[in-house]
Design a protein with these regions (language model features):
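PLP-dependent amino-acid enzyme catalytic core
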Residues: 1-450
Length: 450
């Protein structure tokens, strides 16, 4: 399978290059030159299959350039070996359902891709006898999932940037108490967008890239986005629901659903649910591309203003030249504040959107607990609020994280006497470095510790 950049379709890249680079050399994101298509008969034949078999079916066209079938099967089984016996589960909330994606090691949906990505790199690096330096920016869950998945793996050092004092305490401790010698935590005095911009600068810096082999652990990495399509496939095959409500910040999770749709799965509507940082909702509903400063909310993993994976979708609609111009201008806030009407119409054909305030989120946590005895984390609550505001029925709302990760918000709404059915202890001391939003300081820290 060949890959191209979202900003240049003239140069082909191999799966191995995509795995090594993370970000395309021109600053774009990697996408397949041609997305594999499955027939409806092939898809229907998956009904009754387990999660491992569905994963193998979806991943094999992308991984066979790197591994043989036996190794792919081993990677999948080892990746999910630390999950609960029930890898995914479903709960009813009246007219709609919850797809519970908190059965992994760090109790968030990021585990489903990150554990697989770690195994892909582990097997690949053994094969080629190479060392890699993984870089990631996180608003909370990506960092903890990456650290849990990659800690202790030979030939890998992992550096994670998070916005200082902008994650939940639980999220921060999941990142900072690993005790692993190959893990380096950076608390940046800035926003998630600042963290993400520094990561992208690292990939473009010629001097650092001559010294280190960088690759991305964020969803800018194609092999991070791809595995998330598996749980949408499992949900469709097991629940017969083809509409999904996805709490959205960086657009990676819902792009994975769109990818599955592009592969032939009969997905109907994809509903983008945002908090007050609602650029995705504004683009889809009103064609409004204005950028605003990040607002802190009670769903911090979605406190994002520039949604990186949106570039993958727009590359399909706009083509590489217009995509390159748009995102280069966005980085300088010099872009047009509206998309061409034909492009906006394509968005509207595939996506609905809505947004939720922090107050609405708190009310939803309270109402869902009182009516169904189900605890929602605030990000999941964003999705449920949006489904109700759109008056949607028979949709699958993604439950992105276990509520124990966001006890501050849950306890504010429901009090302290809540049974989370999870007993989590952080036994190691926290270890992280606080840095200013400065590229040179970050580069010096990496040189000192890598």
């Amino acid at each position: 399978m060949k890959y191209i950049s979202t900003r240049n379709n003239k140069t082909d890249f191999s799966a191995e290059q995509v795995l090594n680079y993370g970000l395309a050399p021109d600053g774009g994101l990697f996408i397949p030159k041609e997305i594999p298509k499955f027939s409806i008969d092939q898809i229907n034949a998956l009904k009754g299959k387990n999660y491992f078999d569905i994963a193998n079916f979806i991943l094999s066209p992308f991984l066979l350039d790197l591994f043989d079938s036996k190794t792919i099967n081993k990677i999948i089984h080892e990746a999910y070996s630390k999950f609960d016996q029930e890898i995914v589960s479903v709960s009813n909330i009246g007219d709609n359902e919850l797809l519970n994606l908190f059965h992994g090691p760090t109790l968030a949906f990021k585990d489903y891709a990150m554990c697989l990505l770690a195994k892909i790199y582990e097997y690949y690096l053994k094969k080629v006898d190479k060392k890699l330096l993984l870089i990631g920016a996180t608003s909370g869950d990506t960092g903890s999932a990456a650290i849990q998945a990659f800690k202790g793996i030979d030939n890998i050092s992992i550096f994670i940037l998070h916005p200082h004092n902008s994650t939940s305490l639980f999220q921060r401790k999941q990142m900072t108490t690993s005790g692993a010698n190959n893990v380096f935590n950076i608390a940046l005095n800035g926003s998630f967008d600042d963290c993400q911009n520094l990561v992208k600068k690292l990939f473009k810096d010629k001097n650092l890239n001559e010294t280190f082999s960088f690759t991305a652990v964020n969803s800018i990495n194609w092999f991070r986005v791809l595995p998330q399509s598996i749980y949408y496939a499992w949900s469709y095959l097991n629940c017969n629901i083809d509409n999904f409500v996805v709490p959205s910040g960086n657009f990676g999770n819902i792009y994975s659903a769109y990818l599955l749709k592009s592969m032939g799965f009969p997905i109907n509507k994809l509903i983008v649910a945002t908090n007050e940082n609602n650029i995705l909702h504004r683009i889809i509903s009103n064609n409004d591309l204005h950028l605003y400063n990040v607002v802190k909310t009670n769903s911090p993993s979605m406190d994002i203003t520039i949604s990186s994976n949106f570039e993958r979708l727009l590359a399909e609609f706009l083509g590489p030249d217009s995509t390159k111009e748009l995102f280069q201008n966005i980085s300088n806030n010099e872009h047009n504040k509206k998309l061409d009407s034909s492009i906006h119409n394509l968005l509207s054909e595939n996506f609905l959107s809505e947004n939720a305030t922090s107050e609405e989120v708190e009310n939803q946590i309270k109402n869902t607990y009182e009516n169904y005895n189900i605890l929602l984390d605030p990000h999941t609550a964003v999705g449920v609020v949006c489904a109700e505001k759109l008056n949607l029925k028979k949709v699958m709302c993604l439950a992105c994280a276990h509520p124990v990760k966001f006890q501050e918000t849950v306890q504010k709404v429901l009090g302290n006497n809540i049974n989370y059915n999870k007993n989590i202890e952080f036994l190691n001391e926290e270890k992280f470095e606080i840095l200013d939003n400065n590229f040179e300081a970050l580069g010096d820290y990496i040189k000192l510790n890598a």
